[in-house]
Amino acid sequence: MSLFNHLLSRALPLWLLFFINFLVLLGKSQQEVLQVQVGIVLDTNATLAALSLRAINMSLSEFYNTHNGFKTRIVLNIRDSKRTVVGAAASALYLIKKREVVAIIGPGNSMQAPFLINLGNQSQVPIISFSASSPVLDSLRSPYFIRATHDDSSQVHAISAIIESFRWREVVPIYADNEFGEGILPYLVDAFQEINVRIRYRSAISVHSTDDLVKKELYKLMTMPTRVFIVHMLPDLGSRLFSIAKEIGMMTKGYVWIVTNGIADQMSVMGESSLENMHGVLGVKTYFSRSKELMYLETRWRKRFGGEELNNFECWGYDTATALAMSIEEISSNVNMSFSQTKRNTSRDDTGTDLDDLSFALSGPKLLQALATVSFKGVAGRFQLKNGKLEATTFKIVNIEESGERTVGFWKSKVGLVKSLRVNQTGIKISHSSHRLRPIIWPGDTIFVPKGWEFPTNAKKLRIAVPKKDGFNNFVEVTKDANTNAPTITGFCIDVFDTAMRQMPYAVPYEYIPFETPDGKPRGSYDEMVYHVFLGEFDGAVGDTTILANRSTYVDFALPYSETGIVVVVPVKDEREKGKWVFLKPLTRELWFLTAASFLYIGIMVWIFEYQASGDFRKQSIINKISNVFYFSFSTLFFAHMRPSESIFTRVLVVVWCFVLLILTQSYTATLTSMLTVQELRPTVRHMDDLRNSGVNIGYQTGSFTFERLKQMGYKESRLKTYDTPQEMHELFLKKSSNGGIDAAFDEVAYVKLFMAKYCSKYTIIEPTFKADGFGFAFPLGSPLVPDLSRQILNITEGETMKAIENKWLLGEKHCLDSTTSDSPIRLDHHSFEALFTIVFVVSMLLLLAMLVCRRYRQESKSGEINANNSPTDGNMRAPPNQPTDDNMRAPTSPPIDDQVLEPPGPALNEADDQDQLLNDEVNVGDRNEVDIIVEVDPTLVHRRNLITSKTIPTRRAALFSRIKSA
């Protein structure tokens, strides 16, 4: 017992010491969890603020449950801003001075933000807002303002892409008259300027406006032609706006309404009646990818709060709380979370305010740096600040219906509008669908795309000025009814304008106003008419108004609808070939010489061929030979060569030569006929410089700008004559300069085309063609009609419509195929017949070569026969192979015909002549009767029939016939 007591007395102090140490460590561990004060300034009575607070509390709870080892814990201090700027400022000041918060989450809108930003900058307390999105706040340039959301300016390119895709040319922004509404306007203007879209009017509506004031503003918009409205305001004012718009009939067919994310992101908190009033509206909404973090949060949210869906602001609030908790934990180990006791302003006078003794947070710079570098994958996408704000790269385009919203497409930076996005593990991929939106239900429950521009029924018509002309009325003609004095406007320019206006994507009422004096005379020049458009007296000018640089400073011209250029018209004269030697003109000198040389060449070749084939030809004298040969050659020109040729080579050559002559003579005949019958119209003046040097008179149209152009080119004013009509222009040409007329006219292509349609055979156009921009329709500077009208003019000029209008007014029933001078008939030269003459030459050479080869072969065959006849022969002749071998049918044993030399009857020839005659005579191959007679006389020659008929054995024709005769 004493031992136990002894041990107990010794161990008790140790147990007590252990227990005391445990309590100390336990207390120390409790003291290591640092409570960090964070303020929240929101409109707590607003639905959106209440939902955002739930998301913030849920974010901090889940974050610290997941990171229970963190040494810091955020303690939220919530203050109500009471929906006023003063209330927000007072709440922030209280949190900084009384609670010494190291950061403030808020405010709830952009109007309350400026004062809080300045307050945070002075106290080094970061102001973190996930709902103040106005770009105006960037101008404060405060490093202590962090925008945990997207800038409103990031959506303007998505809006401009929608406007551009439907080719609307004018829009009217309707925005809240405060910092939030005005902040986006400069960015909208820049975005629309890039796509040439005009902002016709800016409608600012105060959040405090009564329904009557809103209705008055909407009625004002109804009187304007623009039907595309972009609404940028918060849901409270937006709901009232659309309710009144539906009431007065602005949610019907033809209207286009596009809302920014100020309304589109908060449609989940808007009532069903508001959505019903917005049926057919397009919305640009912030897009969050369906990440696993977002889907897990939605599951937990439904379990905790029922079936309510998360909106964008709840997601941003959730990520904002997470980012702030991570940043505070990061700096907690080496930064004091308290406030400095040194005041910013140490003034002790009675004029000081609560701001004068405002202290500053020691953790401010480090916390700001930690927030700038924090990065994690949140429920709203990657949370990573760039220049103090989150960046948006994708927006969702929704079509608002009575039951909610329907996605019709997306907009992605650097890509544009797409129908859908396909999300996979590698990120967002653009679908292969066309860069257009899905079908949209527009206001009025229609699927047809509104034109975007309509003239109201109570709007006045456009006053279009038309010139009063004394001539060239085919372009514009003003006639008046004798009874009513009502003007009737017709002409080429009027038809083009009416056709283009009918094809416009919207209806434009207009009326023509003649630019004339009360007594019906022209009121002034075209420059004066254009200037009155500039002054606003007219809404446009239609007529044969030339587009000029000086006029374009006062008005905007649509694209030209007529041919451009200024040309010079001069008379033409007939210069047909005349004279006794005209028959030589069709062929050039070279071709005449080539043809004559070819005749000589053919004659020589015929001589060579006939000399070898015809014995009679060799017996003729040299003069007869030459005359016969060249008569034969030249007679082929008329195909009158009746004497048959003896040589096959001559016949082939003559056939080829006759073919060449046929082509040559036909071409000669056609050219000569053209020279004698077709007019060769030549201009009296070849070039514009000839007019300047000759000093002749030049005509121009009265009131035309060509007068100044001619003076600039150096022509004397005394030499310039005016005309009003094509007939007067023609009469001046007939007078010529010597009688006070003109020798040339300087005018635009359109007028010249009309003149040439009537007098095309008497005048022509000479070079050069001077530059001019053609006729165009004039409108006031910046008119939205110009781009659309220009597009319709292009459609007209590229199709058959313009041709039909020109045929109606400018060409009529008479068409000039060519307004230039007629070319004289082309003379035939040797280049056109080189191939034919080459063929003749090649064929003749081949025939000559063939003749030489045949002659050499005959000579060799003859030599072989002579040698065979002089050799010893067998006394008994063998019967031919085809003869019967019967003893009673033996062949006669007459000696071979070549072995007998029979003298023909008549005078004897001397030995030399006889030998020469025998060596040169041949059996005519084509005469088969002669050979048959020879065989019948001497049957022993049957076996020699082939030799006789093959032209290879020279025979002595006279000796053979002598033998036949004696037999």
Curated annotation (Swiss-Prot):
UniProt KW keywords: Glycoprotein, Ion channel, Ion transport, Ligand-gated ion channel, Membrane, Receptor, Signal, Transmembrane, Transmembrane helix, Transport
Membrane topology qualifier: Multi-pass membrane protein
Subcellular location as annotated: Membrane
Tissue-by-tissue expression: Expressed predominantly in roots.
Domain of life: Eukaryota
Carbohydrate attachment residues: N45, N57, N121, N336, N345, N424, N550, N795
Biased composition (Polar residues): 864-874
GO cellular component: plasma membrane
Main location: membrane
TM region positions: 591-611, 622-642, 652-672, 833-853
Single GO term (MF): ligand-gated monoatomic ion channel activity
Stretches of the chain found on the membrane's Cytoplasmic side: 612-621, 643-651, 854-967
Segments for region (Disordered): 864-913
Pfam families from the UniProt entry: ANF_receptor, Lig_chan, Lig_chan-Glu_bd
Family under the similarity heading: Belongs to the glutamate-gated ion channel (TC 1.A.10.1) family.
Assembly with partners or alone: May form heteromers.
Role, per record: Glutamate-gated receptor that probably acts as a non-selective cation channel. May be involved in light-signal transduction and calcium homeostasis via the regulation of calcium influx into cells.
PANTHER family, alphabetized: OS06G0188250 PROTEIN, OS09G0428600 PROTEIN
Protein name: Glutamate receptor 2.6
Organism of this sequence: Arabidopsis thaliana
